[in-house]
Amino acid sequence: MNIKTLNGLTALVSLLVILPAIAGAETRELLLAAYSVPKEAYEKRIIPAFIRQWKQKTGETIQVRSSFAASGAQARAVVGGLEADIAALSLESDLQQLVKAGLVTYDWKQGAQKGIVTTSIVALGVRKGNPKSIQGWEDLTKPGVEVLYPSPKTSGGAMWDVITVYGAGLNQGKQKGLAGAAVDQHAADLVRRVQRNVKVMDKSGRESVTTFERGVGDVIVTYENELLPRIKQGR
């Protein structure tokens, strides 16, 4: 897998809130409800480090269970009754669902980082050797090029993907000397032309990457942090 980092990319954010503790628990156990992409980072690094730090700080041993799904689906699950103690989602609108449901009892934006715990950018992942010669966003619209990104109906990452394509279209329009509504029309047209080449729209960013690794598609639009570890592993 190769990576193409292009101009006109949109920053991605991971947003976190601490939900009210559930009374009456017999053991000190926390449930993390998070969007799917940072699964390995949480399970291999962040959660073990938190458990060690908490033990050193308080002397208390805790256990952390985790649930990973597309950001929008995860938000609906928590509102619907999933008893999460911590929610890490990829869109502010998903977190606001928890706020409206009365599940967040403090101003989650009040900290120095405004609730944002990680950032990344949108990038393009291509097959080894880049056989379709993908160099820019226009290449995603060419006949015969199969594109992958998840469904914006369920995936927060997919919304960032689409916004990034739109932003690239805005930049293109301005570079061509367009102005006003013509720039917006150019950007919307780029989104439509890319969408026509989308082969599969999975429920989450992680599922989309898995589909790409199974040999489906020529190029994937996803988080850069999803691509870099795979490139290092020669995948």
Ranges and model annotations:
Residues 173-235:
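Ligand-binding pocket segment of bilobal, Venus flytrap-like solute-binding proteins
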Residues 11, 90, 117-121:
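Short, solvent-exposed loop/turn segments at the edges of secondary structure
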Residues 34, 38, 42-46, 70, ...:
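Stable alpha-helical elements in mature extracytoplasmic
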Residues 81-87, 144-146, 214-222:
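Alpha-to-beta junction loops
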